[in-house]
Amino acid sequence: MVMFKKIKSFEVVFNDPEKVYGSGEKVAGRVIVEVCEVTRVKAVRILACGVAKVLWMQGSQQCKQTSEYLRYEDTLLLEDQPTGENEMVIMRPGNKYEYKFGFELPQGPLGTSFKGKYGCVDYWVKAFLDRPSQPTQGTKKNFEVVDLVDVNTPDLMAPVSAKKEKKVSCMFIPDGRVSVSARIDRKGFCEGDEISIHADFENTCSRIVVPKAAIVARHTYLANGQTKVLTQELSSVRGNHIISGTCASWRGKSLRVQKIRPSILGCNILRVEYSLLIYVSVPGSKKVILDLPLVIGSRSGLSSRTSSMASRTSSEMSWVDLNIPDTPEAPPCYMDIIPEDHRLESPTTPLLDDMDGSQDSPIFMYAPEFKFMPPPTYTEVDPCILNNNVQ
């Protein structure tokens, strides 16, 4: 019977554990081994991998696909470590043995580290400890990679605009139309940027409508000729009600890009895309939706912002740092300060549900309930009787 020797410690440690790597950069670290008793080691090996994987069940069929970005193998050696017979390393208790490693990530596009419901992009280093007459022992450590997406390219700095009109009917009788046109100054943004929205809304139907905007993520998984798409709302902002026969405009309505992963556009089995949806909720009818594509980058484009955007950011930073605005501003609209940002708990939740979780779009206009003033306070003690008793 073979007795298995226990290893006290066997781990992969990176030189910079918090670092996020990019293409062409060097990943360096060491494999640390400590033993409980004298142990002979044939070799310490590492395998570094970067793989995109998608997997889901469609009926009884398993849809599965992989795409490899990185594969690196090496056998590590100790520095100035005596070896025994057959070139084996003799490890003794109380000592710490460190095997250094280093490799460069491939040049060119790499998939950004990502974990989704039906797929992921993972990078890791796995170490193997080979011992005679003992099973190979392994340990694994993940590291993070971000594919650099430069939002300062001419294509991503160009404005994006769209417009749409919808005819509304009630019981097959025409009931006017709802139209929306919108524009944003650029297509590429980074985490923390403010999207300045310029939009015009017109409502000629008999219903009250509500304009809103939302940043939406779309995760697309492809395998075996099948496609799975999940959509998730990340943050949103809304405007005031637009009554029948009126128009409304947004001039620089602001929506902040939350902490999200950069777009993944170069992978052939997994994509992460973002959009700005500007839409109008019409009671009893489908929404009027504009879809403006966004690219979320990993390299800031602050140097190329417009002066209005720069002044807006500067004003907000002054408010945060000094708690005193540089110049007095008009108070915000009440509806603008109501927190509307929310994240769907499940990616399978329908996007932009017709009910919107609130009753802020009544079909008919109504007057608020009239409330009478409360009666004055009174007492059951007659003041006249009280005065007579005193006299």
Swiss-Prot record:
Gene3D superfamilies reported for this sequence: 2.60.40.640
Q: Which UniProt keywords apply?
A: Cell cycle, Cytoplasm, Disulfide bond, Isopeptide bond, Phosphoprotein, Transcription, Transcription regulation, Tumor suppressor, Ubl conjugation
Q: Does the keyword Oxidoreductase apply?
A: no
Covalent cross-link Glycyl lysine isopeptide (Lys-Gly) (interchain with G-Cter in ubiquitin), where:
K212
According to the UniProt entry, its GO molecular function terms are: ubiquitin protein ligase binding
The processes (GO biological process) annotated in the record are:
cellular response to tumor cell; negative regulation of cell division; protein transport
Q: Which residues carry this modification: Phosphoserine?
A: S361
How is this chain modified after translation?
Ubiquitinated; undergoes heterotypic 'Lys-48'-/'Lys-63'-branched polyubiquitination catalyzed by ITCH and UBR5 resulting in proteasomal degradation. Deubiquitinated by USP5, leading to TXNIP stabilization.
| One Pfam family this sequence matches | Arrestin_N
Q: Where in the cell is it found?
A: Cytoplasm
**Sorted alphabetically, which InterPro entries does this protein's record hold?**
Arrestin-like_C (IPR014752), Arrestin-like_N (IPR011021), Arrestin_C-like (IPR011022), Arrestin_domain-protein (IPR050357), Ig_E-set (IPR014756)
Sorted alphabetically, the Gene Ontology cellular component annotations on this record are: cytoplasm
Q: What does this protein do?
A: May act as an oxidative stress mediator by inhibiting thioredoxin activity or by limiting its bioavailability. Interacts with COPS5 and restores COPS5-induced suppression of CDKN1B stability, blocking the COPS5-mediated translocation of CDKN1B from the nucleus to the cytoplasm. Functions as a transcriptional repressor, possibly by acting as a bridge molecule between transcription factors and corepressor complexes, and over-expression will induce G0/G1 cell cycle arrest. Required for the maturation of natural killer cells. Acts as a suppressor of tumor cell growth.
- Family note: Belongs to the arrestin family.
Binding partners and assembly: Homodimer; disulfide-linked. Interacts with TXN/thioredoxin through its redox-active site. Interacts with transcriptional repressors ZBTB16, ZBTB32 and HDAC1. Interacts with DDIT4.
Q: What is this protein called?
A: Thioredoxin-interacting protein
Which species does this protein come from?
Pongo abelii (Sumatran orangutan)
What gene name is given for the protein in this entry? TXNIP
